[in-house]
């Protein structure tokens, strides 16, 4: 691990830049009297040090110097395994756990271990049942902030993940990854019985049923069989008359989500929900 770059792009250069600053006790604000393209970046403000790039204030020179490495592009800590570099030692140490396999954060409930404390804290919500993120649009709650953000996009119509090949956009990165297989031709799922390959696991699973038990989920009312339990659940509504999807605009209910989504597109101006 060694500082990179030269001039102001090094740790020594940054220290020199700050230490050249001469400030009397009566000065409220003083610009660094240093040489180089970034000479106005660091200023002394009373007993604090302020970064002129972003306005962040520090109470020590050393903290300001370390912070300025972000603006200067200096990454002091470099991983010898993969070459990735970091501004902060704490980030470097955390990254090294990926290579070492170290997982120091342990769940006291079940013993599962993690390499980051933040991952452990998120995981513990499985045991506590805590769902701190609530959607203001529909009231649905979520354990994880990332899932909450993705859900919120279904209300705004925003789709952050775009395919560079065809421009199609998606709410979820996993959906984009799945879609990309269409362009790459990747078929990672291979049937052990006949050797046929498939792009999607769902299609592969459905195919594998033809070699084994067929359709394991059977309707008790009419005897129709299904590959998946959710397909049987959806079919059962044709017998029970259950309609769990309700359009709040017209108070109309639907037995199937596809019909509900089609109705919702009318109200949302054609945006997929």
Curated annotation (Swiss-Prot):
Name its species.
Answer: Gorilla gorilla gorilla
Q: Does this UniProt record's set of keywords contain Hydrolase?
A: no
Q: What is this protein called?
A: Zinc finger protein 80
SMART domains recorded: ZnF_C2H2 (SM00355)
Mention one GO biological process in which this protein takes part, according to its record.
regulation of transcription by RNA polymerase II
Q: Where found?
A: Nucleus
As for what it does, the entry says: May be involved in transcriptional regulation.
What family is this protein classified in?
Belongs to the krueppel C2H2-type zinc-finger protein family.
Q: What are the entry keywords?
A: DNA-binding, Metal-binding, Nucleus, Repeat, Transcription, Transcription regulation, Zinc, Zinc-finger
